[in-house]
A protein has these predicted regions:
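Short S/T/G/P-rich N-terminal loop/turn motif that feeds into the first structured element of a domain
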Residues: 1-86
């Protein structure tokens, strides 16, 4: 089975950046403990627009990690799987 990925978009206002950074650290620790990789990117042209990526070796691992996440995942059923190229 191929790797699976989820993507979540979040908009953060300037006064909330510090709290958001703490939340990201907590999520990073959670997903690492669950056997997943977690990345966050901020849009270059729109400060405060973030994309969060969580990757797992399979859909079941990612679903378990989302189910026990420290914050609710907006659409936990929306998963993307890696496409094997010929």
């Amino acid at each position: 089975m191929s790797r699976c990925l989820s993507i979540q978009r979040t908009l953060v206002t300037p006064p909330d950046r510090e709290k958001f950074a703490v939340r990201l650290q907590r999520k990073h620790a959670h997903y690492a403990q669950a056997g997943c990789r977690y990345w966050v990117f901020e849009e270059t042209g729109l400060r405060g627009a973030f994309l969060e990526f969580c990757e797992a070796p399979d859909a079941a691992t990612l679903a378990r990690a989302h189910a026990s996440a420290p914050e609710r995942v907006l659409d936990p059923a929306r998963l993307y799987h890696e496409v094997e190229l010929p």
